[in-house]
């Protein structure tokens, strides 16, 4: 424990330039980057106009579960079919926490297929 406290004291004594150099050295040594990840989706424009400029068609869509409906068990099963990375608890939380994004950055065809499956299971769904 004393070693950690000493390390904290040593790091606290570094100047900004020394801390920046330490950061670069650790990035090189560990093969990582301290850069903040780039946001995937931008917020809609304040004007409320079209999301894409005229002449350009939107190519990536987000499937949003707006309500789980009365048949939540069926909806949870379909969510897990669409998102196999989710466990039962995560899928249940997604359905009960609607509105939630089910899947992001998908093609129009895939978004329509997901919407159809979820609506057949009893959910209310939007594509954005």
Curated annotation (Swiss-Prot):
Species for this entry: Phenylobacterium zucineum (strain HLK1)
Taxon lineage: Bacteria, Pseudomonadati, Pseudomonadota, Alphaproteobacteria, Caulobacterales
CDD domains: Ribosomal_L7_L12
Quaternary structure and partners: Homodimer. Part of the ribosomal stalk of the 50S ribosomal subunit. Forms a multimeric L10(L12)X complex, where L10 forms an elongated spine to which 2 to 4 L12 dimers bind in a sequential fashion. Binds GTP-bound translation factors.
Superkingdom assignment: Bacteria
Keyword Ribosomal protein carried by entry: yes
Alphabetized InterPro entries for the sequence: Ribosomal_bL12 (IPR000206), Ribosomal_bL12_C (IPR013823), Ribosomal_bL12_C/ClpS-like (IPR014719), Ribosomal_bL12_oligo (IPR008932), Ribosomal_bL12_oligo_N_sf (IPR036235)
Any one biological process term the GO annotation gives: translation
Protein name per Swiss-Prot or TrEMBL: Large ribosomal subunit protein bL12
Function, as annotated: Forms part of the ribosomal stalk which helps the ribosome interact with GTP-bound translation factors. Is thus essential for accurate translation.
The keyword Ribonucleoprotein is annotated on this UniProt entry: yes
Sorted UniProt keywords: Ribonucleoprotein, Ribosomal protein
GO CC, alphabetical: cytosolic large ribosomal subunit
GO MF annotation, one: structural constituent of ribosome
SUPFAM superfamilies in alphabetical order: ClpS-like, Ribosomal protein L7/12, oligomerisation (N-terminal) domain
Family: Belongs to the bacterial ribosomal protein bL12 family.
């Amino acid at each position: 424990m004393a070693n950690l406290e000493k390390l904290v004291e040593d790091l606290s004594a570094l100047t900004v330039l020394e801390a920046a150099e330490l950061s670069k050295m650790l990035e090189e040594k560990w093969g990582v980057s301290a850069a903040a990840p780039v946001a995937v989706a931008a917020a809609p424009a304040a004007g409320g106009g079209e999301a894409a400029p005229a002449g350009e068609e939107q190519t990536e869509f987000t499937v949003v579960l707006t309500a789980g409906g009365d048949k939540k068990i069926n909806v949870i099963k379909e969510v897990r079919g669409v998102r196999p990375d989710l466990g039962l608890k995560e899928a249940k939380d997604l359905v009960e926490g609607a509105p939630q994004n089910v899947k992001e950055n998908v093609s129009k065809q895939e978004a329509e297929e997901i919407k159809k499956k979820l609506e057949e299971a009893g959910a209310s769904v939007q594509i954005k």
